[in-house]
Every structure is written in structure tokens, then in C-alpha cells.
Amino acid sequence: IEGKSLAAKLKKLWRNDYFQTAVIIGLIVAIVLGFFYGSQLVLNTAYPTLTVETGSMCIPYDGACNGWSHPFDRTLHVGDILIVQGVKPKDLNVNYPNSDVIVFHEPGNPDKLIVHRIVAEQEINGKLYFQTKGDGNGLYLWPSVPPVSEYDPWTGGQGISQDLIVGKVVARVPWFGHITLFMRQNPIGLPIVIAVIILLVVLEFVLPLVKEKKKPVEQKETQPGT
């Protein structure tokens, strides 16, 4: 009897419209989190996606490097979402100008990630170091071969140690990163995005339920002869 009572309660709970809405929202959150942590495993890096915040990797066209114009050129624009894949340092392509664009921790500031292209490689005491440069930095813009003086001055010009490399950029999605930048750079950005998400949930799930409950109950037709 207790088992039947529990089953009846669960069945009644499942029929509750608000409970169903909560379950749907929970599933959406679980899918988002599952995608993020799952992509970490698949791409073999703790940072599977990043947003381009500066124009150091962008080559200006007609003076524009804002992420909205020429979005599909072979450079990285502000507002791009980058897909990053973990890779063994020895497997990186160092043949400039077609070398890999890598993501690495800034020397001396491990909390900051840098996205630049490899321009040269050297081995010191059995460890690989990579000289890097932003495609849009300096006078020699990619794909022009830059002089050593335009290499990034990391660790006194020695380059980036293989231990600091997070991965390489394998793909990018234009424009959508501006949402992330808006949240980071604007004090009210995150509250606005959260409010929009809540509003969409209300319009999509909650409002239809409220309207459904307000519908008048249809009167049963009276059978003839009663």
C-alpha cells in the first residue's frame, strides 16, 4: 500500500505544470554544464572555449578591426569564440606563416591567457620554447616574416616554455563572443543577460501554463432524457 501511495504521489507531482517547468530548466542547465565539462575531456584542455578580447591577432581592413567587419578572414577578431584543443608541444606546427595559433599562460601572470601565433621554436636543455607574435602587432603584419625585434618579449626573448601552453586554436565562431564581452566589461551586463534568460523561460514555459489554468472549464453537455 505504501508503495502504491508513493507512486501515486510521484505521478501527481509529475503532472504538476510547475514541476515540469522546473525539470525542463534543470535539464537545460545540465546540458550546458555537460557540454562544457564534456568538451574539456574531448578537446583535452581545461580551456576548450575562449573569447577574443583584443585586436592583437586581427589585421585591420579599411581601418576596421572591431569583430563585425570581415568576420571570415584568416585572422582573429574581437568577439570571436575560439575552440581550443590540447596538444603535445612537439606536435605543434612551427612553420610560419602557416604555424599554429596557440593559447598560453602569460609568463609571470598565470591567470591571464594569451592567444598568439608561433613564429619560431628553439630547444633549451631538453625543453621547447616558442617565439610568438600577434598577427596584427608591429609593422610586419601576418603573413609577412617579422624580424626578431618584433617577437613577443616573453622571458627576455627566450620564448614561451612548453609548460605554459594550454592548446592550439582549431576553430572560431564570429560575433557570439560579444555577449561574453558585454557581461565582463559592463557592470550591468550579467544582470541583463540573466534577466533576458529568465524572461525567455517565463514566456516559453510559465506563461502558457498560466493561460491554460485560466481557461474556463467547459460545461458537460446534458444528455437527453435526464
Identify what each model region corresponds to:
Residues 68-74, 94, 106, 110, ...:
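Extracytoplasmic/periplasmic, Sec-exported soluble proteins
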Residues 119-178:
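Extended, hydrophilic extramembrane loops/domains of integral membrane proteins
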Residues 44-47, 106-117, 153-161:
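Short coil-to-beta-strand transition motifs
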Residues 79, 98-100:
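Loop/turn positions that initiate beta-strands
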Residues 1-91, 172-226:
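Protein maturation boundaries and topogenic segments
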Residues 52, 101, 114-120:
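Short beta-strand-centered aromatic/proline hotspots
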